[in-house]
C-alpha cells in the first residue's frame, strides 16, 4: 500500500531523469548551447567569447619559417575541441581550458600532433592562446595567438584568425 506522502517522491523520481537529459542536451549540443551563449554574451559582453568556427593563420617555427595553418574549433558550454592542420601534420585536442585572467580571455590547449609522414613519430604540445578582439568590435574577427612548446623540445608561435563561424568545414591539407 502506497502512502499518500510517498506520491510526490515517486513523481519526482519519474520526472528527474528527463530533466537531467534535457539539461545535458542543452549544454552539450551546439544547436542549443550557441543561442544560449549568444544571449548570455548579449547580456554580459565580458563573458568568454564563442570560438566556434573556421580559423586560418600560421605556425612560425623557431627558425622563423612560417607554415600555413587551418583549424576548426567546436565549442559548447562544457568543452572545446581544436583541430589544427598544416601541410605536414594535424593536431587533435587532448585538453582545452578556457579562462579569463585579469580580464584577458585565454585558452590553455594541449594537443597530440600526427605528422603526415608516417615514418615520423607523433608528439604532444602545449600552448596558451590569447583571445584577441573579443570586446573591441563585434565586426572584427577573433584572433588567437601564443607560443607553443612540444615534447620534442621545439617551440614557436601560433597565430590564427577566425574566418567563419561554421564548424562543419573540412580544413585538412591531406
Identify what each model region corresponds to.
Residues 1-46:
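N-terminal alpha-helical membrane-insertion module
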Residues 38-174:
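Central antiparallel beta-sheet cores of small beta-barrel/beta-sandwich binding domains
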Amino acid at each position: 500500500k502506497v502512502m499518500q506522502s510517498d506520491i510526490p517522491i515517486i513523481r519526482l523520481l519519474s520526472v528527474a531523469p528527463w530533466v537531467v537529459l534535457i539539461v545535458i542536451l542543452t549544454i552539450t549540443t551546439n544547436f542549443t548551447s550557441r543561442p544560449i551563449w549568444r544571449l548570455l554574451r548579449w547580456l554580459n559582453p565580458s563573458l568568454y567569447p564563442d570560438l566556434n568556427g573556421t580559423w586560418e593563420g600560421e605556425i612560425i617555427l623557431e627558425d622563423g619559417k612560417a607554415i600555413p595553418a587551418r583549424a576548426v574549433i567546436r565549442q559548447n558550454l562544457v568543452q572545446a575541441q581544436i583541430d589544427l592542420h598544416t601541410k605536414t601534420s594535424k593536431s587533435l585536442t587532448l585538453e582545452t581550458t578556457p579562462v579569463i585572467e585579469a580580464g584577458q580571455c585565454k585558452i590553455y590547449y594541449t594537443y597530440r600532433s600526427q605528422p603526415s609522414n608516417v615514418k615520423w613519430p607523433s608528439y604532444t604540445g602545449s600552448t596558451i592562446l590569447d583571445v584577441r578582439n573579443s570586446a573591441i568590435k563585434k565586426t572584427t574577427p577573433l584572433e588567437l595567438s601564443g607560443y607553443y612548446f612540444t615534447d620534442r623540445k621545439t617551440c614557436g608561435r601560433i597565430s590564427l584568425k577566425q574566418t567563419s563561424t561554421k564548424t562543419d568545414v573540412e580544413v585538412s591539407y591531406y
